[in-house]
């Protein structure tokens, strides 16, 4: 009986020990479950933050795409404006070439008038012969002016007026020498003015070539800007300022061209006044 009691007590101790171990394992499991729950909550919070960041990044990407599309549109518009500027410069160059040709014709007419003056200097000829030679030279100058652009029609009419004045001068043969001297001096001044105008035309052509080269350089910069899309907006603003500057310079060149043309008209007007 005692043995059974001892055995029962041993089993009771064993069961009690096992119960304690089971309780310890249960507490440890509960702690692990609690830690896992905390970690799950943290992961959920992290997931929310990541999703929010992803949404924000997607929105920023959409905005960047819109900005890039707008920048590409502005670049395309600037390319078109540059093409129009190049075409405008080509037309200006053609007009300058035409003006240079007409200036050369006018210079040739002045040379013919100079040759006429030298003929008149020959004292061995009579006043009538000198006036006839002057009339013939002025007729040649008139023929050259009629072959020029419509803009020089007025010059031809003024030369005809000079021709009429010279015909009337035949009636004043004895006083014609002083008139011839004045005409010689005026022709010399006109020759100098024409040479100055030729130099001005040459400089204007050089400036046109320089501006054309600048626009080619600007076109290359625009192509480079397309490859650097992330800097497109800043590049577009910079190129816009450059295009505006070139447009202003082109307007100035057109004004200078008009000034040269007006000066040429004034020179012929002064020549015809005599």
Swiss-Prot record:
InterPro entries attached to this UniProt entry: Tropomyosin
Protein name (database record): Tropomyosin
Subunit structure: Homodimer.
Entry similarity comment: Belongs to the tropomyosin family.
Coiled coil: 1-274
Organism, scientific name: Metapenaeus ensis
UniProt keyword annotation of Kinase present: no
Chain's role: Tropomyosin, in association with the troponin complex, plays a central role in the calcium dependent regulation of muscle contraction.
Signal peptide: none
Record keywords, A-Z: Allergen, Coiled coil, Repeat
Residue numbers spanned by region Disordered: 1-45
């Amino acid at each position: 009986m005692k043995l059974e009691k001892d055995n029962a007590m041993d089993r009771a101790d064993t069961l009690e020990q096992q119960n304690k171990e089971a309780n310890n394992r249960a507490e440890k499991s509960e702690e692990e479950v609690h830690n896992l729950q905390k970690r799950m909550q943290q992961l959920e919070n992290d997931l929310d933050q990541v999703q929010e960041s992803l949404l924000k990044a997607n929105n920023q990407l959409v905005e960047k795409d819109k900005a890039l599309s707008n920048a590409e549109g502005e670049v395309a518009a600037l390319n078109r404006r540059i093409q129009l500027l190049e075409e405008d410069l080509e037309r200006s160059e053609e007009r300058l070439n035409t003006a240079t040709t007409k200036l050369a014709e006018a210079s040739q007419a002045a040379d013919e008038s100079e040759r006429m003056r030298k003929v008149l200097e020959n004292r061995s000829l009579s006043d009538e012969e000198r006036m006839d030679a002057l009339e013939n030279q002025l007729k040649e100058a008139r023929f050259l002016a009629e072959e020029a652009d419509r803009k020089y029609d007025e010059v031809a009419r003024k030369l005809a007026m000079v021709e009429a004045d010279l015909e009337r001068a035949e009636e004043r043969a004895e006083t014609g020498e002083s008139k011839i001297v004045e005409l010689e001096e005026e022709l010399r001044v006109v020759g100098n003015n024409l040479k100055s105008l030729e130099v001005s035309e040459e400089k204007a052509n050089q400036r046109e070539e320089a501006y054309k080269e600048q626009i080619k350089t600007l076109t290359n910069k625009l192509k480079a800007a397309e490859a650097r899309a992330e800097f497109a907006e800043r590049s577009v603003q910079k190129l816009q300022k450059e295009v505006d500057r070139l447009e202003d310079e082109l307007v100035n060149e057109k004004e200078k061209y008009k000034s040269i043309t007006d000066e040429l008209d004034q020179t012929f007007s002064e020549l015809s006044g005599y």
